[in-house]
Amino acid sequence: MGSTGEPDRKRRLSSSVAPGGGAPVSPAKRLAVAPTSEDKKLDFTVLKYKNQKLSEQLEAHKFEYRALENKFAGLKEKQRTHNETLSLVNSSWEQLVADLKSRSFCKSGSPNSSPGSGHNNVQKDGTCAPIERDTLRSLVESGATESSGCLPGCHLGSDAPPLHLSTANALGDIFFPSSDLLQANEECALAALTKLPENDRSKQLQSTSSNLLSSLNNVVQALSNLQLKHKQLAEDYQNQRDSSARKRAEHRRLKEELASAASELEETNYKLAALKAQRDNTQGARIPYPTLGNKSMPEDKVRDKQREMQDLEATHKELSELISKRLVEIKRLHEERIEILNKIATFQNILMDFKSIRSSKAFQLVNDRLQKSQAELDHYQTLLEKLQVDKDKFVWQERQFNLKVDLAEIPERVSTYCESSIADLKKDIQKLRDEKNMLILKLEEASREPGRNQVITKFKALVSSIPREMGAMQSEMTKHKEASLELNSLRAEVHSLSRILSRKERDNEEASCRSARAGSDITQLQSVISDLKQTNKELKLFADMYKRESTDSREIMESRDREFLEWAHVHALKSSLDESKLEQRVKAANEAEAITQQRLATAEAEIAESGQKLGTSRKDLVSLSHMLKSKQEECEAYRVEVECIGQAYEDIQAQNQQLLQQIIERDDDNTKIFMEGVKAKQTQDALHLETYSLRRNLQQESSLMDLYNQKIVSLEDQLKMWSDRVGKLQEDGWQQSVSLSNYQRKLVDVHRDAQKLMQSLDGIQANVGSSRLEVADLLIELEKERFSKKRIEDDLEVMSRKASSLRAKARESAVLEKLRHEVKEYRGILKCGICHDRQKEVVITKCYHLFCNQCIQKSLGNRQRRCPSCSLSFGANDVKPIYI
């Protein structure tokens, strides 16, 4: 209705207010523009109110977000503690698995526990025998590795290997070799007992074996009990884990409910803001102004306006009802929010109360179970160590038994070896006898041959000439060594001379630099002297010029002469002073130049001498290098000769051996005598060496005795020092014991203070809990006050809007009266000026005066056709109709 009536109203207003195109703006139009500015002010206040509401909602959301952040931090801390306990359990379990693996490795490392020792417990394809497989399956199914399956690492997927497989492998490594070992030991024991004779030792062995079997059965029973307890612990841990999962699910559900409640609250806030905006728009709508025209408003239009007003009132009632419902919902949500804040505060206090956490049943149960599991783990570890010790003892006994068996087989092997060695020795003796007979025959043949004395003399001459040649060669080698040493010394001298030459060159360069500096100083001084001379000449010229001037009076001339004399005296003094300084500088420079020239001359002489020495040393070096080359060539020739002589000597030695063999074969008596003489000489030399060594040892022992005496003296001094230090250390120990007792007393006091502090901490925690509850109550009260304040502000704003709307209505009523009066005036203007009843319908084009058609027709019927307003004559063609 309102949307269809708006264009009609605009059309009526445009048709009624446009009598002419260039007419000025009427006052009604100016008044019609005023309410738009008021609407803008109302819109601005509405926007300001909305912004305020949105800021308050933002603050509330921030508070909720902070509360949720605190809750999330508490839950995160709880999760961290849970993760720490879980990591501790995981580490203990991994340590247990590692210990099991190490035990299994120790078991598999025994010599008789290998899978290929001849037992039938392991099949060819590497799979275990049915007994071990059933044992492992029963262990895994009964829960020996369930706790490892409960760890977080087992839920990582197929990529991460589950821990229960490692524990199963470790248990398999322990149980399978132990079963193989038990079976092998049983077989060995049965075989040994069957082979042993029936006596006391065999009975003792049987009794010990039965005792070992009973102890092994006890260990197996203990392991089964350990398995049952482990299964119970795994079930308890699984139950605890299920309960923690349920708690996490409950926590997740509560978080989702909180998020949904927050989202619903946001939606309701958004809807409420939209409804408030609609209400503000309905309250701030403009009152439709009556249209202007030359006739009264029709009844159907009035009815349409009434219907529109009724519809607006109905919508206003609906909106007010909806607003009341939304306010009730907001109150309910506010109460729910306060309840949630109370719950969050209580949860925070519960989570942050360490005393209640420590005193909680779950924490105590977990702590007791951990302690029990730790004690059981230690107990079972000791049992496992005992089992390992028993196993080692059993392996040692088995080794001793095998050693005895091997010792029983040793005599048989020794007898067979002795028989074979006797047969080999008989064969060797027979071969030696045959060789002896052959040598006897060869000696007889050699004794019959002539020329034996000549061979002996040649051999003796050759032997006597060899040491002379060796002495000559050694003397030549010593000469060559001396020459090489001289060459090294000459090289060292050349290096030293080159260093001296480089040093002299550096000194020469420094002296040349100094002389250059002195020359530059001299040139500077000479330039200064020339400048001073020029200034002196100029001053003299100025003095002559002033003397020649005679234009002034006599007194002025006298004063000027005096002044000139004084200035001349001053300049003379300055010049004398400068000349004296310059003379001193010139003298010093000349002396320095003379000294530098002397040094330069000495340096040049030294450079020349060093150059001559360098040339001579280079020449000597060249000659020595030539000599060295020649000596090296000679050494190479001597080496070749020595090698040739050595080869000849080796050949001669071979011939000598052949000749000696021939001589020995020909003449046994001579060789025997010669050997006896050689032996006598060797014994004499050995005796001389022994006497010399004894003397030397005696001297060394005497020197050692002196050293030992010195060491004894030093050790006595050290003993005195150590005794003094021990006394000091005893005193320090006594002082430390006193200080330790003091520290222990302080420690007891500190423990007491710590207990007091713990008690005070408990009290403080209780106070903190109570203060937190008080803070939560204060927050709730603050929230209530904020809510009531918001309600009051909303009511105040509604009342202010009502007051503003009433003021606007009052203003609009006054404006309506004015408009009605103006409408009457405009209607009077639009009515005909002759009859004052009908509307103006025609215009006289000569004077542009408006009248109704009937009055103009009456004037046209008369003879005098004149305008009633200006009495201007017009014709029928001058009358034109208009449409207003």
Curated annotation (Swiss-Prot):
Keyword Protease: no
Source species of the chain: Oryza sativa subsp. indica (Rice)
Coiled coil region boundaries: 49-86, 216-541, 580-663, 696-762, 789-827
Gene Ontology molecular function: any one: ubiquitin protein ligase activity
Keywords assigned: Chromatin regulator, Coiled coil, Metal-binding, Nucleus, Transferase, Ubl conjugation pathway, Zinc, Zinc-finger
Pathway(s) per entry: Protein modification; protein ubiquitination
EC number: 2.3.2.27
Domain notes: The RING-type zinc finger domain mediates binding to an E2 ubiquitin-conjugating enzyme.
Composition bias type Low complexity, residue spans: 108-121
Any single Pfam family the record assigns to this protein: zf-C3HC4_2
Protein encoded by which gene: BRE1A
Disulfide bridge partners, by residue number: none
Localization in the cell: Nucleus
Protein name: E3 ubiquitin-protein ligase BRE1-like 1
Any one GO CC term of the record: HULC complex
Family as reported in the entry's similarity comment: Belongs to the BRE1 family.
Enzyme class: transferase
First and last residues of each zinc finger (RING-type): 832-871
InterPro entries reported for this sequence: E3_ubiquit_lig_Bre1, Znf_RING, Znf_RING/FYVE/PHD, Znf_RING_CS
Disordered: annotated span: 1-37, 107-127
Role of this protein: E3 ubiquitin-protein ligase that monoubiquitinates H2B to form H2BK143ub1. H2BK143ub1 gives a specific tag for epigenetic transcriptional activation and is also prerequisite for H3K4me and maybe H3K79me. It thereby plays a central role in histone code and gene regulation. Forms a ubiquitin ligase complex in cooperation with the E2 enzyme UBC2/RAD6.
Domain of life: Eukaryota
